[in-house]
């Protein structure tokens, strides 16, 4: 789970 979470937080 390191796709939407990363881009979402950024």
UniProtKB/Swiss-Prot annotation:
Keyword Secreted: yes
GO CC annotation terms, alphabetical: extracellular region
GO biological process, one term: neuropeptide signaling pathway
Entry superkingdom: Eukaryota
Subcellular location: Secreted
Keyword Ribonucleoprotein listed: no
Keywords for the protein's UniProt record, in alphabetical order: Amidation, Neuropeptide, Secreted
Positions bearing Arginine amide: 10
Function of the protein: Contractile action on the inner circular body-wall muscle of the animal.
UniProt protein name: Urechistachykinin-2
Species per Swiss-Prot/TrEMBL record: Urechis unicinctus (Fat innkeeper worm)
Lineage: Eukaryota, Metazoa, Spiralia, Lophotrochozoa, Annelida
């Amino acid at each position: 789970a390191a796709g939407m979470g990363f881009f979402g937080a950024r």
